[in-house]
């Protein structure tokens, strides 16, 4: 998947820098991307476990944008192996410390330029889809498609449109962005797209995915489904 669109590339680079700097105090159980002093949607470790237990991700699992490890830990309990990919070396270091599972392999890569080297039984991403710029949405889902074995499943968790009331999103060069502040006062703009679950399911159906997207508590949604082209 190629970034292409220059505003999208700038947005992705700023977003990566923010998460590099946020890694040391990022919560393992939720998005926690609003920075110091802000209201945050979080998902407890028990909720992480319940969602992954429901998914039952056996075999080889790919986790995109693995972050500090809240979901990685639970995926590793079920899977034969987990490949955890993230653009941030600081997040990967935090994940290794938090998870410490022998069946997890870590890959540092820009997810907007990365290509899978094998196919997986399950592809999972938690709190990442809302950070995918509109211009990268279809290319991102082609990466997901290329990562899945025939009969494989994709699953994800994220904030939905109800969470938009906690944020202020502005279009910057056509990319929906939200302002985040670090503890030292520095500010960054990150991509933030709040999907309505029905709209997301319909959009994915147009791309030949059969994915059920349901609302959860606390302004979150979960999706699971299959590639109709497989």
Indicate where each model-derived feature is located:
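Conserved class I S-adenosyl-L-methionine
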Residues: 2-56
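Class I SAM-dependent methyltransferase SAM/SAH-binding core
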Residues: 62-113
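A conserved beta-strand element that flanks and buttresses the S-adenosyl-L-methionine
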Residues: 124
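Short catalytic micro-motifs in class I SAM-dependent methyltransferases
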Residues: 127-128
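A short glycine-rich, Lys/Arg-flanked "PGG" loop and its adjoining helix->strand segment in the class I
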Residues: 138-150
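Conserved beta-strand signature within the Rossmann-like core of class I S-adenosyl-L-methionine
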Residues: 151-159
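C-terminal alpha-helical "lid/dimerization" subdomain adjacent to the S-adenosyl-L-methionine
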Residues: 159-203
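Conserved Class I S-adenosyl-L-methionine
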Residues: 190-226
